Amino acid sequence: MSARKINRQDMRDAAEKYKNWGKWGPDDEVGTLNYTTPEDIVAATRLVKKGKVISLALNFDHTGPQGAKSKYPSMGRTNPIHTMLRTGTDAYSGVLDKRGIRAADDMVTMPLQCGTQWDGLGHVFYENYMWNGYDCREVTSAGAQKCGIEKTKNRMVGRGVFLDVARYKSVESLDDGYGITNADLYGTAKKQKVDLKRGDYVIVRTGMMERCQKAGSWDGYPGGDAPGFAFETLDFVKDTQLAALASDTWGCEVRPNESEAGINQPWHWITIPIMGMTMGEIFNLKELAD
């Protein structure tokens, strides 16, 4: 990581260097997901050998990471609030019989970034623009009129590539503030004997989530200091032409950020609105790593 802080001019230069606006036409709303072709999806299905299913998600419940202590200001996100609308007790008492059916029902109230999730292309803006040059005012109190995450519902399928950077560096977890470099990513792929291909979904393990789980506390995880992608890995994203990138940290990129005051999450500024790449955050990778 460079000792010099990334400034506004660096951000302008990066926006110009990595811009994909118009690459898939003026009306595109899914960005780098376009790198994955139907042929790629068919090829990916042929890689299945055991049929074992591994979830990479945390449970959506009160034990999640949001709301834990952090040295940075809160983003206002909370863990899911679960409310029962009908229960087995209601059924047993007979109060449901007037409806002619005994059943349980419930509801969940939560921020959409409360746990394991994908950042949509309407999430982060570069100045007053989102992906493909759409005006940020397309996101209103009624929701995202452009680049909503729902646009990806029939697109997010492809070959997954797991890069265990923590294991490559011979540690249980990368240190907070460690910026993962291009060399780390390519070195991990080489050690694992993986050839990265256009349209891949790359999942990177830092070990941070497991560190928190082992300690029995999420304090410092949501919005705190963390290992993550250094700003230089924008080259990796560009050169590999990957479809999407995910990690086991709260915000993917290294924290504290490499930028000067007033530029929060600079890697996000470029990957989402400029390059059109959705990213996955808070992925639970322990079972996959084992």
Regions found by a protein language model. Give the residues of each.
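Active-/binding-site microenvironments in catalytic and ligand-binding cores
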Residues: 1-290
